[in-house]
Amino acid sequence: MKELKEGLARIYGDKLKAVYLYGSYARGDYREGSDVDVMVLLKNYRDYWREYHRSSDYISDISLKYDVTVSYILIKEIQWKEEDKPVVRNIRREGLPA
């Protein structure tokens, strides 16, 4: 996770607020073939897909390097603080900061 966070910091700079591991790897109940779920918390952005694609090649490289699928989502800082969507609640409950 340290390598992943450092790479994302190079891509997003000051926009990157945090990186969280969640899902089966965070809970410790992953199995062979489980993906690694990651939430990338960004200060702000206008276009989700533009920001997503900024890091997609890097995430793919990490997936290939470690032979594991990294599934990631981006969340705005304001969403993290104010929204009550199931995915946000789940990450708050079980997420591990990188």
Regions found by a protein language model. Give the residues of each.
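Catalytic core of pol beta-like nucleotidyltransferases
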Residues: 1-17, 27-32, 43-98
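Short beta-strand->loop micro-motif that forms the acidic, two-metal-ion catalytic signature
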Residues: 37-41
